[in-house]
From Swiss-Prot:
This is 33 kDa chaperonin. Belongs to the HSP33 family. Its main location: cytoplasm. It comes from the Bacteria. GO terms for biological process: protein refolding. It comes from Actinobacillus pleuropneumoniae serotype 5b (strain L20). The keyword Zinc-finger does not apply. It is found in: Cytoplasm. Keywords: Chaperone, Cytoplasm, Disulfide bond, Redox-active center, Stress response, Zinc.
Length: 296
């Protein structure tokens, strides 16, 4: 893919004379690294790309330190799809299938009867969870409905996934009326109509400044400094070792015997493998016992 300085970047911007705010994001390596360790069907890849874009945009518009999880659950061939993001624009994604999925499968064909769950978990403050029926054709439309119901703010999303110069890419735009109530439906409708004219090659190939000029050259747009996005799993040897300790020691010993003295743990998200023999497990247990004694 030809390099532009705005690959894997998120921009925020404000229409000064319209009381509407916007965001633009393009996920290049962030998206491809999510897919590298999995052989997802094409339709699932595209859905995860849409969810990554949506999570990035949501995380940026909700100003807090913490994490957002966007999760789809259903009874169709796609059992689960989940994306996590935080205020640093660190993103990860995972999907689980339970039957074959055609490359051109629609959302309803993949999910069956399902829900979209958005969990907002600030580092300081109360956790919030919203559950939305997946009763619309696209994730974009379901999320727009979520904003109307939960935030009571008119919001418009453009979310695209595909290939650009031979590599997977995902990108999107968000428009939202400012919460101060000074924005008008006419202003919002005007900007929304302009946003819908964006072409895939513009969304995936142009730098932010040029893209925004093409779409909004007659508007007064204040663009803020960008934020980098990245794939970040967050797994570690320590977390995997502590997960093993959730099992009774008798069961751990049985697993060691069955696996020739070494238990291997593979991260479902990034594919990293961690190996533990009896000595390593006992070291984790001793450390856990010390923390328990200290009441930590």
């Amino acid at each position: 893919m030809s390099y532009t300085k705005d690959n894997d970047k998120l921009y925020r911007y404000l229409f000064q004379n319209r009381a509407v705010r916007g965001e633009w994001v393009r996920l290049n390596d962030t998206f491809t690294e999510t897919l590298n360790t999995h052989q997802y069907p094409k339709a699932v890849q595209n859905l995860l790309g849409e969810m990554l874009v949506a999570t990035s945009l949501l995380t940026a518009i909700m100003k807090f330190e913490g994490t957002i999880t966007v999760q789809i659950q259903g009874d169709g061939p796609l059992k689960l799809a989940v994306v996590n993001g935080n205020e640093k624009q660190q993103l990860r994604a995972l999907a689980r299938t339970q039957a074959e999925i055609a490359d051109n499968a629609s959302l309803s064909e993949m999910i069956g009867n399902g829900v979209l769950v958005i969990s907002i978990m600030p580092n300081d403050g109360e956790r919030y969870q919203g559950v939305i029926a997946l009763d619309k054709p696209t994730i974009r439309e379901c999320l727009e409905d979520y904003f109307i119901r939960s935030e009571q703010l008119q919001t418009h999303l453009v979310i695209r996934t595909g290939e650009y110069e031979g590599k997977a890419v995902a990108g999107g735009l968000l428009l939202q009326i400012m919460p101060d109530g000074t924005g008008t439906p006419e202003d919002f409708e005007h900007l929304m109509t302009l946003a819908e004219t964006v072409k895939d090659e513009e969304l995936f190939g142009l730098e932010a400044e040029e893209l925004l000029f093409r779409l909004y050259h007659e508007e007064q747009v204040e663009v803020y400094p960008p934020q980098e996005t990245e794939f970040h799993c967050g797994c570690s040897r320590g977390r995997s070792g502590n997960a093993i300790l959730l099992l009774p020691m008798e069961e751990i010993d049985e697993m060691l015997a069955e696996k020739n003295g070494v238990i291997d743990m593979q991260c479902e998200c990034c594919g990293t493998q961690y190996f533990f023999d009896k000595n390593a497990i006992m070291e984790f247990k001793q450390e856990a016992d010390k923390l328990n004694q200290l009441g930590l």
